[in-house]
Amino acid sequence: MRHYEIVFMVHPDQSEQVPGMIERYTGAITAAAGTIHRLEDWGRRQLAYPINKLHKAHYVLLNVEAPQEAIDELETNFRFNDAVIRSMVMRTKHAVTEASPMVKAKDERRERREDFANETADDSEAGDSEE
């Protein structure tokens, strides 16, 4: 089986349907004896240029190992689902399991924010005890 990286963009008004879509698409891959190596829901993001007069879309990234029939079925599902405004399927040489740069940056920002919140909470507690 070959490895693929799949990115699809969902209409921003249909964001609440994304978890169901992810479940349906991952179910189709696993039913065809495929493996999902990475699944990232990037959320609603700004588009580089307007698509169908839209400026935002909900992004989802999948890295999978699947037979060609499963990928063909997935592409057909993308094509006939009106909520999916764009999709891209690329073949890769190896399975990618590490977090994408977008998720890494988001995690680092969250960690810095939590560290800052902990430091300010510690400082306020220390200031209260000195009085």
Swiss-Prot record:
Which stretches are tagged as biased composition: Basic and acidic residues?
104-116
**Matching SUPFAM superfamilies, A to Z?**
Ribosomal protein S6
Comp. bias (Acidic residues): 120-131
Residue ranges of the region described as Disordered: 98-131
BP-aspect Gene Ontology terms: translation
Pfam families for this protein: Ribosomal_S6
Give the molecular function GO annotations: small ribosomal subunit rRNA binding; structural constituent of ribosome
Which CDD domains does the annotation name?
A: bS6
One cellular component (GO) term of this entry: cytosolic small ribosomal subunit
Key words of the record = Ribonucleoprotein, Ribosomal protein, RNA-binding, rRNA-binding
Q: Could you confirm whether the keyword Nucleus appears in this record?
A: no
Query: Which cysteines link up through disulfide bonds?
Result: none
State the source organism's domain of life.
Bacteria
What's this protein's function?
Binds together with bS18 to 16S ribosomal RNA.
UniProt similarity note: Belongs to the bacterial ribosomal protein bS6 family.
HAMAP family, per database record: Ribosomal_bS6
**Official protein name in the record:** Small ribosomal subunit protein bS6
The species this protein belongs to is: Klebsiella pneumoniae (strain 342)
UniProt lineage? Bacteria, Pseudomonadati, Pseudomonadota, Gammaproteobacteria, Enterobacterales
Its gene name is: rpsF
